[in-house]
Every structure is written in structure tokens, then in C-alpha cells.
Amino acid sequence: MTLPFQITVPGSSANLGPGFDSVGLAVNRYLTLTVTEGSEWHFSTQSADLVGIPSGKENLVYQVAEHVASQLEKTLPPCHVQMESNIPLARGLGSSAAAIVAGIELANQLLGQPLAAEDKVRFGSLWEGHPDNIAPSVYGGLVIGTHLSTETHVIHGGVPDLDLVLLVPKEELLTKKARGILPESLSYKEAVRGSSVSNVLVAALLKENWELVGEMMVRDVFHHPYRLGLVPHLQEVIRYVKEETEAYGAALSGAGPTMLCLSPKGRGEWVQKQLQKQYPQFEVDVLKPDDQGIQVHRVLSNQQQLPIG
């Protein structure tokens, strides 16, 4: 790959309630890497969301890229990487998965593009342990997947024709903490109920039955009940969204603390205004599903960008 080039990776919202560690949706918040030649590896940023990132080989993007290269028995040339992002860290919008996917794509480009999309998802899922954020960042749109010890399977479910309204708390919530509060096991009865709800969620998503999607989002048994104490107002927001707004439903975005609301197309700003008035302590944003996934462009001398692949 000829330097310089630019990699753009969307953020994502995982789970949509009961689709735990399996369902994810790409959103139009982005991590961008601008890659140029360098005498040694160096990472820099001007983004407020990335202040304090490691500038050398301890950077997650480099660590992932180097891992991919070592698995392919290749050596990466040193580069300067300018990182910019409007994906908030530790808020449940797939910031770490976006960095992992960016590292995989960085290695892919520097090594002559040997990886297919499914290879990227496999590398990313092995690193993170599940595909619910990785796969949407690779493919864009809605993705349903499962990650096994020997293989990772994902199905692309198209791009939902929805507005996404997000309530973003000021506080961070690290995924490690949010996972640490989950139980080691569920009873057989709870597992069956959780599985059936998740099955209906996926079927409703694929049939674009948004009212039913909203009903299933609030019936999760896998993580919502255990994370209520970590996310103030979660139960109240879910009830308010369902009963007082036009949105179909709400759920934690990933591990939280951001809360995701699915809104009819074109009505997101109206829902946003209602929620901002009701919950002034949160930042309330209207987003859309990303339909592209990873994008790579060659940066020309006049700063124009030429799509690759």
C-alpha cells in the first residue's frame, strides 16, 4: 500500500438489549487514522476524546497491527499515525473495538491487503472475545454473530432505516467493571427465557418490525438486571422512552453507560428534544447507522482522497 493513506472505522452499539455479545449496529461516529512514513512508530492526536493515548508501541492500534503481522509472519514498516476520533471512550460505543479494527486494517494495508473481511472479524473477535462490536465496525450496518474457539460466524442484517438517539452520561464505565458484575451462570429457566427473547429480537430486526424490537429490547435477562446499579436512571429512561416518546424502545449501548433509543426515521430530533428536556444531565445526540464499515483512502498530495478497494 502506498503511503500516505487514511483508515476510517465506525463506532458501534452492541447488544440492543438481549442480543448479548452477538448483535451489533455500526453508528456514524468514527475513528480515523492518517498513516505516513516514519523512522519509528509514533501516534499523535488532536482529538479531545483521545487525549493521553500512548504515543509509541504501547498504543493498542500498534499492538493489534503487530499481532496480525506476526500471525502472518510479516514485518511492519514504521509509520507515523495521526489518530482522530469522535467516539467517546468507555461509554459503550465501541471505541476499543474501533481501535482493534483500525489496527487490523493498518496491518492489512501495510502488508499488501492479504485479509478478507471475514479474516478481519476473526482477528478482532479473537482479540476482544466476541464479535458484537468488531463485526459492525468491519461491515457497517446491523450484524449478528457468534464467536467460537475455532471459528467466528457473522450474518449481515442490512442497514436499519432508523434514527438513533443516544443519552450519553458524563461518567465513564469501563467494560471490565460492567462485566465483573455479571453472574457466572443463569438458571436453566432464565437461560431459556433469555434465549427466546433474543431469538425474537433478531427475527424482528430482520423483518424490520420495530415495535416488536422495542418490546424485546426491554426484556433482556443477560445483563440489564445486573447493571442497573452501575447506570443511574437506566430503568427510568427505558420506561420514559417507551411511554412518553415516539421511540420504539431503549437499552444500554454495549456495557453502558450510554443508552440507545431506536426512533422512527426523521423523528430522532423530536425524540432528542424530549429527552434533553427530561434529562438535562445527559448529552443527547441523534446518530444514524453507518452503512460502510471500514473505509480506506489514499491521501493525495493536494489532500484529496482516493478510495481503495
From Swiss-Prot:
Query: Main subcellular localization, coarse class?
Result: cytoplasm
Instruction: List GO molecular-function terms, semicolon-separated.
Output: ATP binding; homoserine kinase activity
Q: Which compartments does it reside in? A: Cytoplasm
EC number assigned by the record: 2.7.1.39
An example of a Pfam family matching this protein is GHMP_kinases_C
Question: In what pathway does it function?
Answer: Amino-acid biosynthesis; L-threonine biosynthesis; L-threonine from L-aspartate: step 4/5
Catalytic activity, as annotated: L-homoserine + ATP = O-phospho-L-homoserine + ADP + H(+)
Coiled-coil residue windows: none
User: Has keyword Cell inner membrane?
Assistant: no
Q: Which NCBIfam families match?
A: thrB
What's the protein called, per UniProt?
Homoserine kinase
Q: What is the gene name?
A: thrB
